[in-house]
């Protein structure tokens, strides 16, 4: 009886072709998975906290509190979650830098170039941003409580959910001004 049921289900020869296709598919899937696992990832470079200030430097997660970086070119730098409290960045070039979630309380950024910089969630409490150029920057979720923004043009700058200079929270769709 079992043979009769087997022949009904798989035919006279037991349908070995279907079994072979299944095994081949499993082998191919295994090879593809192994190739994906062994392939290099597009991971960010390791932070170098001892690196000198330069364009593209990676100081993410480093402590640079109180650093004197007056007029330094830090364009395209990676400084995610970097401690820059009380740092002197007057006139520094931070164009295109990633300062997301950086701690910059009390820093001096007067006259700095922050065009296209990512300041998403950055702590900017008490920061001096006077005359800073911020076109194309993203300040959503940033904390600007007590910051000095004299002669700063925020036109087009996302400020959604940022904490404004006076402590109020900007509306999620705020751009250029805190609504």
Language-model segments: residues:
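N-terminal intrinsically disordered, acidic low-complexity segments at the extreme N-terminus
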Residues: 1-9
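Intrinsically disordered, low-complexity repeat tracts enriched in Gly/Pro/Ser/Thr and acidic residues
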Residues: 3, 33-37
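Tandem repeat scaffolds
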Residues: 11-17, 21, 37-179
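Core hydrophobic alpha-helical transmembrane segments of single-pass membrane proteins
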Residues: 25-32
């Amino acid at each position: 009886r079992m043979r009769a049921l087997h022949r009904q289900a798989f035919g006279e020869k037991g349908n070995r072709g279907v079994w072979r296709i299944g095994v081949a598919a499993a082998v191919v899937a295994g090879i593809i998975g192994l190739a994906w696992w062994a392939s290099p990832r597009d991971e960010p470079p390791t932070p170098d906290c001892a690196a000198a200030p330069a364009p593209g430097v990676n100081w993410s997660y480093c402590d640079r509190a109180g650093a004197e970086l007056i007029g330094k070119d830090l364009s395209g730098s990676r400084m995610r979650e970097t401690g820059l409290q009380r740092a002197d960045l007057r006139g520094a070039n931070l164009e295109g830098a990633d300062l997301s979630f950086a701690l910059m309380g009390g820093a001096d950024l007067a006259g700095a170039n922050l065009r296209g910089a990512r300041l998403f969630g950055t702590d900017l409490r008490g920061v001096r941003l006077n005359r800073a150029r911020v076109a194309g920057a993203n300040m959503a979720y940033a904390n600007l409580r007590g910051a000095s923004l004299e002669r700063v043009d925020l036109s087009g700058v996302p400020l959604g959910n940022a904490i404004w200079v006076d402590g109020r929270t900007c509306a999620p769709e705020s751009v250029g001004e805190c609504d």
